[in-house]
């Protein structure tokens, strides 16, 4: 299988920039396993396609404002996206620019109320950062962080709650499903 097998044209005007007011009006693509035919529907029609014994899996993870903008001691800017909580204040992260965030690099966020040190680089290019702070980490993220929107979403997010799934409860996702 080649990566090019997954390339396709997607006109920009078909990419929703904001969530629909009525979530059950979102589009639903169905596949008939017997014929291979696909059909377009709307989400509120989902019960029409379910059968007794079908299993639905609900994603109840809340997206955290995992995108942080900080500065290095040199004054250079750093973007950090939290990917995975490793415990003890350590997080696996994406950093930009990656070359400028080598182990030992210190980063300050906000007015210094949240700081981090790059403690190691992973083979895949991700970095492990150790965060230092007083208080509750998720509260600092709510104050300092932004939702990590995908690059094809160009509009600024105005309501963090609209980016959550309707089932969201437990904080931890770095992006919406």
Regions found by a protein language model. Name each.
Residues 1-177:
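A cross-family signal for N-terminal binding/gating loops and helix N-caps
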């Amino acid at each position: 299988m080649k990566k090019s097998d997954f390339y396709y044209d997607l006109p920009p005007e078909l990419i929703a920039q904001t969530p629909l007011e009525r979530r059950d009006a979102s589009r639903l693509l169905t596949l008939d396993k017997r014929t291979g035919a696909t059909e377009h529907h709307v989400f509120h029609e989902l019960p029409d396609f379910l059968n007794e014994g079908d299993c639905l899996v609900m994603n109840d993870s809340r997206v955290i404002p995992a995108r942080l903008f900080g500065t290095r001691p040199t004054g250079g800017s750093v973007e950090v996206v939290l990917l995975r909580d490793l415990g003890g204040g350590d997080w696996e992260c994406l950093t930009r620019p990656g070359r400028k965030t080598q182990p030992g690099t210190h980063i300050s966020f906000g007015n210094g109320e949240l700081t981090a040190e790059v403690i190691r680089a992973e083979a895949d290019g991700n970095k492990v950062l150790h965060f230092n702070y007083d208080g509750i980490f998720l509260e600092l993220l709510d104050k300092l962080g932004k939702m990590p929107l995908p690059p094809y979403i160009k509009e600024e997010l105005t309501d963090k709650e609209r980016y959550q799934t309707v089932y969201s409860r437990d904080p931890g996702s770095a992006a919406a499903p």
